[in-house]
Amino acid sequence: MDKNTLTGLILMGLLIFGFMWMNSSKQKENQQQQQQEQAEAKKAAADEPQITVDSISAAEAAAIPAAIREGGVRQGDGDSYVYNTPSVRLAMVNGEVTGSVQTADTTLDYNDVIANRLSRDITLSTRNEAVKNIREVLSDTRRYGQFASHRTGKAGTVKLGNDKLSLEISNQGGYISRATLLDYKSYLPADAKSEKIDTADVEICRPGCNKYSFELTSATQRINTADFFFTPRQVSDSVVEMTLDMAGGGQFGFRYTLPKGSYVVRMEMIQKGMDKVIPISVANAKLIWSQKMGRNERGRTFEERNSGLYYKYVGDSPDDLGAQGEQTDELTQRLKWIGYKNQFFSMVMIPRTCFTSAEVASTDLKKDPDFVKALASEAFMDYSASEANPITIDIFMGPNLYPLLSSLDKEIPGADKDSLDLTNLIPLGWPIFRWINTLIIIPVFTFLSTFIKSYGLIIFLLTLFIKLILFPFTYKSYKSQAKMRLLAPEIKAINDKYPGQENAMTRSQKTMAL
């Protein structure tokens, strides 16, 4: 065997050995990876919750008819009720319940769910969802009583408006979700870095940024109108009702009335037969009102400084919570009204029978480019379940115009003769300047604006008018100043002729003689 042959055999052996070694290492790595994947799969299977079949117990099934009587709507005079929500549609006649249960992907027969005789094609998650929806009938009825069937629904709005104001009333809570002033435009940059200005109708409140509700609390229940879906009814062009129909024939809701040409919408709580639903021990209702106040002007600083939460004690002057920073306060006396004031526009709640007390809060939103403040109030009012209209609130939503705010005392009747003093929402300066503004400046400005559309021209004419009024008082001053200008060269000559401190007396005598 020569040297070359030996070298070739050795190289071939090394190559075979290396291939076998590499193949063995790869098999070992694959085996380890498979073991790791199997371990992870076992762990994931152990961590994954096991879906078990749920079902309605006999006790729960027996309680359903009573729950439908409590939370459903009675049909006729017999033992006939319906209980309809987006998840269940049930009907009961003489204790026999029929209907359907809606899940995410199908509709099931109520009695099939109760008896657990669903098709094998129905998945476990669908079965459990149907059981959950039926159980909600029991839990909602225990918590909300006759209000239970109104817990769920499809959100929507109904419109109400006149030539000044356009309103959208949400059926979810029965409150005014949007209020638009038709005669006024906002003046905002298109974006933070743009010089372009976008104009749009001013919105006093907008969806997601303004909400109010009423809360009734007894020893066993806490009912908040924000939890329910109301049924809207357009009574007329100026009246809308949002109602909840009860099982025993009772009714609860709100009536909104917006007269033509007015910035004031009247909100009345309407009810019938509620003394059988709300315990007689419930003697007050809590108004919960929150608002993120949006910007309307390009200049944020001045708008923020002139926006805030205002209120008026009965028999006292209006006050505010403080224009800057985070402020809270407990108002323990009777209140005539509570208002959220923007620089040029306001929304004010004015109850007919006053608020008995309130807790108020204000927070600056300096980091939010679209809003200036977050305002909140919780105000208590007298309530009686036996009255047809236990609560009436007039809601002003409009511009801070002195003549308009002053006229609201005549437009809004009250339980007492105490003035609203809503004109105090307008900053008119110290008392003496306030008198001048209210007695002279504002009447003249209002008169000129009736036939002159340019505010610049009005301000120019108003300046001339003020100059004419002040002329008799300033004439002598102007005359004295003119004489001094004429005598100035001669006085200078006297000063030059008699210089020095030793000639001071002589200079004074010569000047007086002149």
Task: List each model region and its residues.
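Interfacial loop/helix-cap signal at membrane boundaries in integral membrane proteins
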Residues: 367, 398-455
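Hydrophobic membrane-insertion alpha-helices, especially the h-region
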Residues: 8-20
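Positively charged n-region of N-terminal signal peptides that target proteins for export
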Residues: 1-4
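Membrane-interface amphipathic helices and adjacent TM-edge segments
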Residues: 469-514
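Alpha-helical transmembrane signal-anchor/signal-peptide segments
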Residues: 27-42, 480-491
